[in-house]
């Protein structure tokens, strides 16, 4: 009983015995400490397709490749002049709509490139130097 009286007096004076808190162990979460390494110098392999359409209807497959962000070299030498002009007109419209670029390499050979493909320099001179086209 005396301990209860002493506890009450100590409580009244603001002096209390601290109760020990029982701490339960928390599970430890482990993280993978290995750094995530990404090679920023990887160059994606760019494939340039070569198309030699013989009919105007084949221009759609060229446009599909262009929509898939693939550059295409179009060789129109096997087509008659009016049909080749229709193909170039159609490709020019597609290139404009897709923010791409069309470049004449030589007579009836064109490079049709999507917007993610940068064409720089005088490509005609470079191709002529490589293949002796005149």
UniProtKB/Swiss-Prot annotation:
InterPro entries in the record: Cell_div_SepF (IPR023052), Cell_div_SepF/SepF-rel (IPR007561), SepF-like_sf (IPR038594)
Major subcellular site: cytoplasm
A cellular component term, taken from the record's GO annotations: cytoplasm
Keyword entries, A-Z: Cell cycle, Cell division, Cytoplasm, Septation
Keyword Repressor included in the entry's annotation: no
Pfam families listed in its UniProt record: SepF
Subunit structure: Homodimer. Interacts with FtsZ.
Known function: Cell division protein that is part of the divisome complex and is recruited early to the Z-ring. Probably stimulates Z-ring formation, perhaps through the cross-linking of FtsZ protofilaments. Its function overlaps with FtsA.
Family: Belongs to the SepF family.
Protein name as annotated: Cell division protein SepF
Protein's organism: Caldanaerobacter subterraneus subsp. tengcongensis (strain DSM 15242 / JCM 11007 / NBRC 100824 / MB4) (Thermoanaerobacter tengcongensis)
Gene: sepF
């Amino acid at each position: 009983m005396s301990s209860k009286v002493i506890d009450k007096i100590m409580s009244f004076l603001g002096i209390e015995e601290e109760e020990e808190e029982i701490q339960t162990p928390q599970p430890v979460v482990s993280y993978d400490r290995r750094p995530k390494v990404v090679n920023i110098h990887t160059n994606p392999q760019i494939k340039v397709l070569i198309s030699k359409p013989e009919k105007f209807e084949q221009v759609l497959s060229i446009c599909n490749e262009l929509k898939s962000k693939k550059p295409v070299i179009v060789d129109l030498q096997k087509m008659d002049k009016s049909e080749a002009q229709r193909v170039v007109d159609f490709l020019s419209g597609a290139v404009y709509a897709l923010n791409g670029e069309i470049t004449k390499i030589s007579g009836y050979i064109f490079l049709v490139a999507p917007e993610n493909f940068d064409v720089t320099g005088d490509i005609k001179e470079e191709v002529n130097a490589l293949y002796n086209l005149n």
